UniProtKB/Swiss-Prot annotation:
EC number, as in UniProt: 2.1.1.-
HAMAP family the record matches: 16SrRNA_methyltr_G
GO CC field: cytosol
Binding site for S-adenosyl-L-methionine: G77, F82, E100, R101, S102, V128, E129, R141
Organism: Borrelia recurrentis (strain A1)
Keyword Metal-binding included in the entry's annotation: no
Record key words, sorted: Cytoplasm, Methyltransferase, rRNA processing, S-adenosyl-L-methionine, Transferase
Pfam families on file: GidB (PF02527)
Protein's UniProt name: Ribosomal RNA small subunit methyltransferase G
């Protein structure tokens, strides 16, 4: 499975070292080890290969991040660290701010970022509605229906910024897009093809209007 992960990284044109791979393996093992204690992942995905698929899905967004040539990314609802920790691990030149409302998960994120030596990670512990700063790039994954949070996320998006939402089935993404397209200057659905047997897309929301 790790061989497939490396192959996917090469297809995505993501540079990596053996240290990156070792740290990813360490991270996944820590997620599995501390899942019960910190309420990190559901029971049905508590195995290494399932976690590696989450990591692969996470890193698939990195080319979009790099294409924007920005200095900082906000990951809202970071949970166990997918995608925030994974992106930060393979993209050390950018700062990743991980926003997580759960105290337990925020503690884990702080712990694992220290153990991985991720100096480009900052963890914030509060609700997204309480965030005061604005960001040029925002990521969300496993965050529910975008219709509920579009205005909230838009309010902390800098002018000219981009929200990248990791999504599943196309018909659902298209349905959500129809409700939020008038809130942004441009809305786009982009296919993610790194996991061949799963339907995955990015919903990209450019420049909040309100």
């Amino acid at each position: 499975m790790m061989t497939n992960f490396k192959f996917a990284l090469k297809n995505l044109k993501v540079n990596f070292t053996s240290e990156n791979i070792d740290k990813l393996r360490f991270y996944i093992e820590k997620v599995l080890l501390f899942s019960d204690r910190f309420n990190l992942v559901s029971n049905n995905v508590r195995n290494f290969d399932a976690m590696l698929l989450h990591a692969l899905d996470s890193v698939s967004g990195l080319p979009i991040v790099k294409d924007k040539n920005l200095r900082q990314v906000l990951d809202v609802g970071s949970g166990a660290g997918f995608p925030g920790i994974v992106l930060a691990l393979f993209d050390r030149c950018r700062k990743y701010v991980l926003l997580e409302r759960s105290n337990k998960k925020a503690i884990f994120l702080k712990m694992i970022s220290l153990e991985l030596g991720l100096e480009n990670v900052e963890v914030l512990e509060h609700n997204v509605e309480e965030e005061q700063n604005k960001y040029e790039f925002i990521t969300i994954r496993a965050f529910g229906d975008i219709r509920k949070y579009a205005n909230i996320l838009g309010s902390i998006l800098k002018s000219g910024g981009l929200i990248m939402a990791y999504k599943g089935k196309f018909d659902k993404v298209e349905f959500e897009m129809s409700y939020v397209k008038n809130l942004f200057d441009k809305v786009e659905i982009k296919s993610s093809e790194v996991i061949s047997d799963k339907e995955r897309y990015f919903l990209l929301l450019y420049d909040y209007k309100c």
